Amino acid sequence: MSLSHLYRDGEGHMDDDEDERENFEITDWDLQNEFNPNRQRHWQTKEEATYGVWAERDSDEERPSFGGKRARDYSAPVNFISAGLKKGAAEEAELEDSDDEEKPVKQDEFPKDFGPKKLKTGGNFKPSQKGFAGGTKSFMDFGSWERHTKGIGQKLLQKMGYVPGRGLGKNAQGIINPIEAKQRKGKGAVGAYGSERTTQSLQDFPVVDSEEEAEEEFQKELSQWRKDPSGSKKKPKYSYKTVEELKAKGRISKKLTAPQKELSQVKVIDMTGREQKVYYSYSQISHKHSVPDDGLPPQAQPPPPPGKEARAPGFALPELEHNLQLLIELTEQEIIRNDRQLQYERDVVVNLTHELEKASGALQQEQRAIASLSEVLALVEECERRLQPGCSDPLTLDECARVFQTLRDKYYEEYRMSDRVDLAVAIVYPLMKDYFKEWDPLKDCTYGTETISQWKSLLENDQLLSHGGQDLSADAFHRLIWEVWMPFVRSIVAQWQPRNCDPMVDFLDSWAPLIPVWVLDNILEQLIFPKLQKEVESWNPLTDTVPIHSWVHPWLPLMQARLEPLYSPIRSKLASALQKWHPSDSSAKLILQPWKDVFTPGSWEAFMVKNIVPKLGMCLGELVINPHQQHMDAFYWVIDWEGMVSVSSLVGLLEKHFFPKWLQVLCSWLSNSPNYEEITKWYLGWKSMFSDQVLAHPSVKDKFNEALDIMNRAVSSNVGAYMQPGAREHIAYLTHTERRKDFQYEAMQERREAENMAQRGIGVAASAVPMNFKDLIETKAEEHNIVFMPVIGKRHEGKQLYTFGRIVIYIDRGVVFVQGEKTWVPTSLQSLIDMAK
C-alpha cells in the first residue's frame, strides 16, 4: 500500500518534491472517491494536447478550474505536517465527503474575488474572516435594518392592529422577546448536564415538566428495595385502588384473554433482554418474568447527593414481584368479573320484569276479549234460539237490528273482526225475506227504504266500499241486496210493461241511493234495457197513438248513454213514416220536436236534411206570389219549421225557391207604373214575415237590399212619361229607414254581446278563488249551453262520472277522460266541447 497520502495537502495534491512524477498506484482515497462527482480531476489543456509531455507550464496562463492542478505558491510559508497527527486515509476521505456534502464546489476553485479567503494556519497571515465569538448578536438591534428602508413590514403589522412592545395575536398572547438559546457545557448528549432551561423559559413556564416528575418517581420506586446506609427506616408508600376505581376502569387482564387461533402457533423471537429468547406463541410471552437489569450503567447512575456517600445498588426479587403482581391482577380481575356478573343479573331482572308486565297486559287483554266474546256469543245464541220455529217469542227484524246495533257500538272490535256475512246470512236473511214477501215495488216504491238504509250502515264493509269492489263473500249488505232484494225486483220487471214507465222510474229513483252501484247497473242493463229495446222494435209511428218519447225520455236521467242503441231504429222508423208526409200535417213536428235535444246535433241535422227539408222545398216551390191575392198557407207551413230546421238550411230553401220568384214579381210590378206606396207596404209586409234571426243572415239581408236597389233604380230612371208625385222621395226614405234599421240591429247585437262578455267576466271574477278544474268545465258548459251534471250512483275507479252533453266523462287530477269504445281516453277541454256540440 502506498504512503503517498501522508504527503498530500488538504486538497488531495502531491507535495512539491513529487511534482515531476505521477504515481499510478490505486490508493484507498481513489477507491472511496471513485463515484464522488466533486473529486479533483485534471483537465487537459490545449497545449498539453498539442505537445504532450514536452508542454511547458506557465503559471500565468493557468486559469481556475474544477479539476486541474493549481500552480504552486512559493512565496507562502512552509507548513509541516506531523506524521503522528496525520489522519488515516479513511478518516480523511470521510471528512472530505462531509465537506463535499456541505459545500459541493470548493471556494478555492473560484476566482480570488469570490468570497472570503481560505483560512491559513501558519506564517504572518491572519484569518481573512472573523468568526462569531459571542454566538448570535443581541436581539436589541433586531429589525434595525428597517431604518434604511421604507418600513413596509412594520406598517403592515400596525395596520393589522400590532402595537410595538406587545405580543402578536388577537389578544396579544404572543411572546415579546425572541426565544433564548442556552449553550451546552460539554459535548455530551441532551440532558447529560442537567436541565437546559433558560431564564426566559423558567419565567414563562414555571411548572416543572411531567417528564422530570416521572423520573423522580421512578428513582424513588427503584430505591425502595435498596438498603439505606444511614440505617434509618423510611415508611414505604403504598398506592391503593378502591373497588369503585376498578369498576370504572373495567380492565381485563391479558392472562384471561384467550389467544386467537391464528396467533396461537406463531414463532416469536424476543430480543428485548440481554439474551435472545424464542417463544412459540404470544401467550408464552405473557408468562415470562419481568426481570429487571442488574443495575443502571455507571454513566447513567445518578450522582450521590452532597454530604452522603455513594451506596451500592440494592438487590432485586423478580419472582416475588411477579407473584405479588399476579395476585393483585387476579384479585382485580375477580372484582371486575363479579361486578360484570352482578350487572348482568340486574339486567336480566329488569328484562324479566318488563316481560312479566307485557305478559300481564296481554293476559288481561285476552281475558277482556274472552269476556267480550262470551257476551257476543250469548247474544248470537239468543237470536238463534228465537229464530227456531215454534218459539213463543220469535225474533223480529227491528229487534235483530237493535242486536246488531249493540254489537257494533259496544263490541266494535269483535264486530269488525267477526265474519258478518255468515252471521247476517244465518239471522238477517230469513227475516228480510219475510219482510219483502208481499211487496209490490210498482205500487209502493218507498216500502222498506228506511229498513234497508239502517241495515246498510250496519252491514256494509267500509274498506271494500272505498276500493270500489263487489266481492259478495266479503260484504254482507251487497250479498243481502243481491240474494234477498233482487229476486223481488226481477219478478216485478218481468211483468212490467215498458210503456208504463213512470212507476218503474220512480221506484229506481227512490232506491238508487241505497243499493250498490253495480246492482243498479245490472238492473238497467240486464232488465230494463232489453224490455225497452224489444218495445222499440215493435213500435209503429203510423199506428201507435202514444208517442214514443213519452215512455223513452223518462229513462234519460237514469240510463243516459245506455239508450244510444235505441236512437238509430227510432230514426229509421220515423224516416219511413215521413215518406208520404206533407208539410201541411203538423203532427210530424209534434213527434220530432222532443228528439231535437236527445239526438246529437250532427245526427239531427242529417235527419232533417234528408227527410224534412226536401218536403219544405217542394212546398215553397208550389207557393204563388200574387200581390193582389196572396195565399200564405204554404209559406206558413215552411216558416213553422224554423226552430226545427237550422237557419242555414232554411235560408237555402228561401234562396232557391222563394226570393227568385219574389224579386221577379217586384220587377214586373215596377215596370207597369205601380203605386209605390203599395209596393212599400208589400215590401214591409213580406219582411215582417221573417224572424230577426233569419233577417240577420247575410244572404237574406242581401236579397232585401237588392229589392231596395231595384226600387231605387225604378224611380230614378226616366222610363215612362208619368211618375207618381213623391215616389222618389218615398222610396229614398224607405231605403234610408231600412238601412238604418239594419245598422241599429247590428249595433244592438254587438252591444248585447259586449254585455254578455262583461257579465261573464264579472261572474268569473266573483267566483271562488282558486277555481278547480271541475268549476272550469262547468263554466264552459254554461257558455256553450251544454248540460253538465253528475251521473247518480255511477263511478269509475272511485271517480264520479259526469255527463257533458251526450258524452260521459270523469275528472282525475285535472285531466278529463272520455269514454271510448273499450277504454277511457284523455282529451282537452276544447276537444270535449267540440265533441259535445
From Swiss-Prot:
Pfam families: G-patch, GCFC, TIP_N. InterPro entries: G_patch_dom, GCFC_dom, STIP/TFIP11_N, TFP11, TFP11/STIP/Ntr1. Transmembrane segments: none annotated. A motif (Nuclear localization signal) lies at residues 700-705. Residues 149-195 form the G-patch domain. The keyword Electron transport does not apply. Residues 14-28, 91-102 have a biased composition (Acidic residues). GO terms for biological process: biomineral tissue development; spliceosomal complex disassembly. Residues 710-734 are annotated as: Required for nuclear speckle localization. Residues 1-13, 54-64, 103-116, 217-231 have a biased composition (Basic and acidic residues). It is found in: Cytoplasm; Nucleus. Residues 1-50 are annotated as: Required for interaction with DHX15. The keyword Transcription does not apply. One of its GO terms (molecular function) is nucleic acid binding. The modification Phosphoserine is found at residues 2, 59, 98, 144, 210. GO terms for cellular component: cytoplasm; spliceosomal complex; U2-type post-mRNA release spliceosomal complex. Identified in the spliceosome C complex. Found in the Intron Large (IL) complex, a post-mRNA release spliceosomal complex containing the excised intron, U2, U5 and U6 snRNPs, and splicing factors. Interacts with TUFT1. Interacts with DHX15; indicative for a recruitment of DHX15 to the IL complex. Interacts with GCFC2. Belongs to the TFP11/STIP family. This is Tuftelin-interacting protein 11. The lineage of its organism: Eukaryota, Metazoa, Chordata, Craniata, Vertebrata.
